[in-house]
Regions:
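Conserved beta-sheet core of the metallophosphoesterase superfamily
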Residues: 168, 197-205, 210-228, 236-339
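Basic, amphipathic N-terminal segments that precede the first structured/catalytic domain
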Residues: 1-117, 326-328, 339-340
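Core catalytic region of metal-dependent phosphoesterases/phosphodiesterases
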Residues: 62-79, 93-208
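Active-site metal-binding loops of divalent metal-dependent hydrolases
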Residues: 80-82, 129-131, 181-184, 245-247, ...
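Acidic carboxylate-rich catalytic motifs and surrounding loops in phosphoryl-/glycosyl-chemistry enzymes
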Residues: 174-182, 222-231
């Protein structure tokens, strides 16, 4: 491609504009640390400015049509507890990005295996919360992160946006649901409940809004904004409850299996779902319900997590969850823990 002097000048100007925007927004964030509403507004303004200058992704070219065979199924990816920004002896933001990319590549690989028997043209993604680590969840957290909350937000948005765009290259349609986690709390508080701001304002929801706006041009993508602490995911006749899991209290340093089952047995009576998906406890588990459905607890991306080792006595092996769903019969037909 022939590049003119004008192209070089325009590119340099775009870089200069982006650098100026970054400096200005970082200055706004520093002056807004004590004022949560201003901090949130600064994040939104930074996202809009960056999108205006750098642009948003053009519509992804759909995959080539495949020869139809078998009864179609749907890939369901539970991507949760990515904790971008957290640092352990074997985990940081760069590792988080690598593991998200690995999750997507393994999802595509396992889908192609399924496609040898039947069509899998649609993918549903559940973003299960705790997308970032943030810096104000507990007192010493500033010593266990590699980026500010502001930087974590935009790293998470960039990483997850890239993941969704990759899925759009492989699936005819993609659908995304989001649920907020306790690490999304804005300001002081306990768990997900903030003392400084209403609970609807949550870093996970803000990340979701940034990504949703940036992917607005993707006509094959259905983006479901988070309206509550949970989402109901519908895949044909299959209906699932998705939530982070932090509403279920644990005591004595153990994963509260009884509490998990008890809560879901109550919720199913008026939410009417087959299965449930949650994270939060950083350990894999599945529990049966009386209605014949199951509760799937998905691990996190974090390895060597002090929380998992000290609080729930779990090994903290990084993994995510991929299921395949028969939308006509309303049931899961194949289950994978995607080890990372």
């Amino acid at each position: 491609m022939f590049v003119t002097l004008r192209d070089d000048i325009n590119a340099e100007q775009r870089i200069a504009d982006l650098e100026a925007t970054l400096v200005r927004v970082q200055r706004q964030v520093k002056t807004a640390q004590a004022r949560t509403a201003d901090l949130v507004q600064a994040v939104y303004q930074g996202a809009r400015d960056a999108s205006t200058i750098a642009g948003t992704a053009k519509p992804v070219k759909p995959p080539k049509p495949r020869a139809s065979k078998g009864s179609p199924e749907v890939a369901l990816l539970h991507l949760t507890d990515t904790h971008i920004g957290a640092v352990t002896s074997s985990f940081d933001s760069a590792v988080a990005e690598q593991r998200v990319a690995m999750t997507i590549q393994k999802t595509i690989h396992l889908t192609n295996i399924q496609r040898k028997d039947h069509d899998v043209d649609h993918c549903v993604v559940i973003l299960g919360g705790d997308l970032i680590e943030q810096t104000g969840q507990f007192p010493h957290q500033a010593w266990a992160v590699d980026a500010s909350t502001f930087e974590q937000l935009f790293d998470a948005a960039r990483i997850i946006e890239s993941a969704v765009l990759t899925l759009l290259e492989e699936f005819a349609t993609v659908e995304v649901y989001l649920t907020p986690g306790n690490h999304g709390r804005v300001g002081r508080g306990k768990g997900r409940q903030s003392l400084d701001y209403e609970s609807d304002t949550n870093w996970d929801r803000i990340v979701g809004r940034i990504i949703g706006e940036r992917l607005n041009a993707q006509t094959r993508l259905a983006w479901h904004p988070c309206e509550s602490w949970y989402s109901i995911v519908e895949v044909g006749k299959y209906r699932a409850l998705a939530h982070h899991g932090d509403t279920i209290r644990s005591f004595g340093g153990s994963t509260p299996s009884y509490g998990i089952v008890k809560k879901h047995q109550s919720w199913v009576t008026f939410m009417h779902f087959h299965d449930a998906y949650l994270g939060h406890f950083h350990t894999p588990m599945q529990l049966p319900m009386a209605n014949g459905g199951r509760i799937f607890v998905t691990p996190s991306l974090v390895s060597d997590s002090a929380f998992a080792k000290e609080f729930v006595a779990a090994a903290s092996l990084p993994a995510q969850r991929l299921h395949f769903v028969d939308p006509e019969r309303g049931r899961v037909t194949a289950e994978y823990l995607v080890w990372l």
